[in-house]
Amino acid sequence: MTNTKILPLVLMLALFSFAACSEQESSPRSDHGDSQTGTSGEQLLPDPGVVSFTFRNQFDEDVPGTLDFIKEIGINNIEFSNLFGKTAEELRALLDERDLICTSFGANYRTLTENFDQVVHDAKTLGARHVRLAWFPHDAPFDLDDAQRAVDFFNDIGRRLAEHDLMFSYHNHGYEFVEDGDGTLFDYIVQNTDPEYVHFQMDVFWVVWPGHDPVELLERYPDRFRLMHLKDMRKGVTGDLTGRTPDRNEYMVGLGDGQIDFQAILEAAQNTSIEYFYIEDEIEDVMNSVPRGYRHITSLTH
């Protein structure tokens, strides 16, 4: 049997499993890194989105079926950085058929520099307002010269995207937290970019991995972050400044299973300019871990 025949069956089984366990897992888990949650109150995050990279293998095989699975979980908002063999028009039609939306579109450095018009077309066709860059090319380790180049590029690309009514956000990836004076090179980038044209997407994993605190960063720059990636880190592990992990499955876990305190982060995020939050799960068992993570993150209250 071919993979294309197998995947729809897998999606159907996953949907059945999700529906069956939703009733069983209605209360917050007690063995995660989050602060203690109450049994009543307002949801901190009632409507999280998801990053398409989470379901990259499933999208590669069956785009409509994967969208159906995401919708069944309760997720309505997807950040795409890949069209998975479709045109932007075709993908938009599939989203519209399911009342799904795309609010952010990811593009890499090369695409932004060499195919800018296509990025604009795809983002606007999908309905995204935000264009996100998740990696700035550099020779490790990231240094002040790299940060200065990044500042120049971000200011320029942010202005160009604004001309098309699009907002540019840079997604931190851990390597920017090299110490520099009284702060880090991430501080240097934030402080030297134009807040009118340059925004940021906080990936909480890639803040914790190099040893920093997402809450402190949100409190320091409450008006600079527009987007957030929610991704958990295995308990007991520590990271570095490379911006990479040796093995995703060794260091990353489903939301609520690791050491990151999402209760505290989402509390702090209430006082910031963040518009959209996206679940990003990079482990192998996303068909089970994402529904569980969704139930966990939407159970947090204040």
Descriptions of predicted regions:
Residues M1-P8:
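Bacterial N-terminal signal peptides that target proteins for export
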Residues S17-A20:
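C-terminal motif of bacterial Sec signal peptides marking the signal peptidase cleavage site
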Residues S22-S52, F59-K71, G127, V190-M202, ...:
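Histidine-acidic metal/acid-base catalytic patches
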Residues G49-F53, E79-S81, T103-N108, R132-A134, ...:
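A cross-family glycoside hydrolase active-site/sugar-binding cleft signature
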Residues F55-E61, N77-E89, A107-N115, H138-F142, ...:
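Acidic-and-aromatic substrate-binding clefts and catalytic sites of carbohydrate-active enzymes
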Residues N77, Y109-H199:
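Active-site acidic/histidine proton-transfer and metal-coordination neighborhood
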Residues T87-F105, A150, H164-L166, I297:
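Short acidic, glycine/proline-enriched helix-loop-strand junctions
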Residues R92-A107, F154-I157, Q191-P195, F262:
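Alpha-helix-loop-beta-strand connector modules within alpha/beta enzyme cores
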